[in-house]
Amino acid sequence: GENTMGSNEAGVRTNADLSMLSAFLCRYDRHEPRLALMAEKTLRYAVHTHKAVRRKACKDGRYWGSTSVADHQWESSLWAMSVAYSAFFQWERLDSLMRDDVYRLLKAECDYELERDIPTGYIGDTKAEENGWEVDVLAAALGLFPDDALAPRWFQRMREFAVNSYSHPSDADNHTIPDPWYDNSTISSMYRGANLYPDWTLQNHDFFHTSYQNVVIQELGEAALALRLFQGDRQKWKSETLLHNCDSVTQNVLNWLTLPDGEQAMPNGNDWSLFLYDQVTSYSTMACMRGDADALLFEQQALRKIARRQQTTPDGAWLLRPDVGARRMGVQGHRVMMTWLMHHIFPVGGMQPADVKDFMLRHAEARILPCQNIVRTMTGDYFAC
């Protein structure tokens, strides 16, 4: 790995994803002793090295995570979400002390979410992705501990972060009540500011970035999945805010950049490895939770490409020469795992994928994304932007 057992993203995220994937395979595929031991040891390390638990320091002598506005770490909620999934998959095998430590970790991360401001901004550095992963940890805590005294506050904060993930200027005047079963809060009352341009595009890393344009769908979908999966037969918490504006972003931007093989065009380039197909879980979210036949088509296309690419590596790695080493392996495994779970929990039933020629015909006209100075067109012979 880049920084095995370290306290930064390269160390913590990689370990958390490894733990989650190992535990997932034990629960849904085969319970092999070595795999179960890996799931348990990596979970223990992730939990014990968190700032709220402190039973063991990372190899650099530090602890990871967020506990308050005064002591927080960028992106720690994303890693904590993977820890929560790992804990859920092996919950029956955890002793009471480990369960308590998992609670302390998630409560600390959520304490930070309750204290902090909800950021917004769309020029160069959208906060859409970051707010999306804050939704994830709040949903995970609600799912695992639905009767906690803080659960109503976690729920409200989760909804606010969800509305302000793909937040659009039109939300300021959106008086829809998303959860009338719970209260009369409107979209406009939870809106803090725009993370999208008026044409539904966004910028991250200082340019129009297709990877970040789609990843919020995946994050919000994983939050909805955690709520449904973790709560089991007793669904106390649910919210229509969790896929807020995902349809509009898909229809106004992403569909116009989606290629027949499931890849998405990147008019301004990409600063990660090319041909990752890591938008696969965004497709799964739209197919399984929104009944989107186009998304089902491109999810299947992307999965075929992912499988073919894996066959080119001698050891079964997801891709050759990954940009961020073992961390990329964890992220890619994370995506494929979530895609499987989406279909397991939200099956598409008899829905058939759209026909690719029909999709191309519906998206054949030239399209302008004015806020990014992008023009695209597609014919049966070429795609250009």
List the predicted regions and their residue ranges.
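Long compositionally biased, domain-poor regions of proteins
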Residues: 1-2
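Aromatic-lined, polymer-binding surfaces characteristic
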Residues: 7-282
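Extended polysaccharide-engagement surfaces of secreted carbohydrate-active enzymes
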Residues: 216, 229-235, 239, 259-385
